[in-house]
Amino acid sequence: MDAELPHSMIGSYLNPPERMYLPSFSQTEASQNCHPGSSPKMFNSPNNQALVSALKTLQEKIRRLELERTQAEDNLNLLSREAAQYKKALEEETNERNLAHEELTRQKKDISIQLSSAQSRCILLEKQLEYTKRMVLNVEREKNMILEQQAQLQREKEQDQMKLHAKLEKLDVLEKECLRLTTTQQTAEEKIKYLEEKLKEEEHQRRLFQDRACELQTGLEISKILMSTVSSSKLCNERKKLPKKTNCLKREPPQHTDCRFRGPASERERPPFRMTSSARAEPHSSGEPFSICDNLSELLRTMQDELDQMNMEHRELLRQIAQTGSHSDSEELEQELEHLARKMESKEDQISKLQKHQDRVRKLQEKVENSRINESSGIHGNPKRSKNLKTSPRKCLSETSAFQKDRSFQPVKVHSLPPRLRRDDVKWEQ
């Protein structure tokens, strides 16, 4: 009891002294009224008083314990509620932490993905930068090569212009030679006309001479008939006088004697004159075509030399392509090879055109030479022609006029030659 009293007075863990319950006066009276019969006896003895006080203290302790129990239950309920709230809050906090952790992991993943994409982009940008650097170097190299090619093309253009100028000068020379040929042809035609007129005059004089010879022949025959009737003595005298008479007859008409000597003289002088005219015409007819052919053949040889030079350059480029190792150099050499191949094709076309033109010029010259040979053979050395001149002068005139038409037809071809050659030259240079 003594041990309980100080403990009850001190208090406990569940019921500290400040929270100790002090019973009220009514409660003490009720407790006293519960035992009315024994109160006088109990209060009379000291033990009873101590017992009562102990009971009172015990009752108070029980009450306190009940109160503490109720308080403990309340506290337990409160703690359970607080624990539930704390657990709920903790769960919410853990959920929030999980969500935050998931968000953080997601952000980390996004950041890692972005970082990897940025790294890949940086690598790609570095590759692009290296590629652009190489492209810039290639462009600068190509620019330098293009400038060199332009300079080379400019030099080639100047050389082509010089060649074109030389070809144009050759064409001017050819045109001058062609004009000279036409002038010589015109002079030859004029000489032919003069010779035809002279032939007409000689034909007329020959006819007069033949008529006079026929008259003399008839006179001689008449004199022979008259002389046959005379005696032999007189016939001898007449025969002696006959040459005198014939000489007198020959001396009397000076026109007949002139015609007699003029005819053979003209016949003797005519072939040399024709030979001289033909000799004058032959150098022009032979020399000028040969000069044209020589110029064309020289031009063809120069173009063949250029084509051979291009072939050598083509082989050299093929050798360089086979020896080179870099792709860019091989592409540049292939481009140069294609350009050279196009130039070679154009040069071959030019050579073929020039050969065709040379063949046409040669055929034209052969036609002109054949016509001139036919003309010279028809005028000079054809005996049938001379017989036809004696028998049918009109036929001779018609043949000469026909030949003159052929001669007038030839200069058209000769005149049409230089402009066609000039056009072909312009095509060759293109």
Curated annotation (Swiss-Prot):
Keywords: Coiled coil, Cytoplasm, Cytoskeleton, Microtubule, Phosphoprotein. The modification Phosphoserine is found at residue 45. One of its GO terms (cellular component) is cytoplasm. GO terms for molecular function: gamma-tubulin binding; identical protein binding; microtubule binding. Residues 248-290, 362-430 are annotated as: Disordered. Residues 46-213, 290-377 form a coiled coil. It holds the Pfam family Cep57_MT_bd. The keyword Protein transport does not apply. Residues 249-272, 362-372, 421-430 have a biased composition (Basic and acidic residues). It is found in: Cytoplasm, Cytoskeleton, Microtubule organizing center, Centrosome. Centrosomal protein which may be required for microtubule attachment to centrosomes. Belongs to the translokin family. This is Centrosomal protein CEP57L1. The lineage of its organism: Eukaryota, Metazoa, Chordata, Craniata, Vertebrata. The gene is Cep57l1.
